[in-house]
Regions:
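N-terminal first-folded block
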Residues: 11-18, 24, 32
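Short, solvent-exposed aromatic-acidic interface loops
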Residues: 8, 12, 80-81
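Short, conserved charged micro-motifs
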Residues: 15-20, 71-75
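An amphipathic, aromatic/His-enriched active-site/gating alpha helix that lines ligand/cofactor pockets
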Residues: 26-42, 56-60, 64-100
Length: 100
């Protein structure tokens, strides 16, 4: 059975464009590699407009990723490129993301 997660990432609004560039340059390359190996079924990042948790000065994003199983998800999370991306992205976050 596929394994999926939805993550709500909160980014300071003044860093939203920089976060999107970083995501496009670093995380999308990882997704492309995993998809070409059959280790990622689908994934997306969407900028949220409006919502019950909207906060001034914060831009929310929904990141969805679906893997064939937990082993493939763990392979993504253990990828050194992802760990490097995550260190940079966390600097833009006023609080921890919500993960389901």
């Amino acid at each position: 059975m596929p394994q999926a997660n939805a993550i709500i990432v909160r980014i300071r609004s003044d860093k939203a464009d920089e976060f999107e560039r970083l995501f496009a340059e670093e995380e999308l390359a990882i997704w492309d590699d995993l998809q070409s190996q059959g280790k990622l079924l689908k994934a997306s990042m969407t900028r949220v407009a409006y919502g019950s948790e909207e906060q001034e000065g914060v831009q929310d994003y929904v990141i969805y990723a679906e893997f064939p199983g937990m082993a493939e998800h763990t392979a993504h999370d253990d990828d050194p490129r992802f760990k490097a991306f995550l260190r940079k992205a966390r600097a833009f976050q006023p609080r921890s993301p919500w993960v389901w």
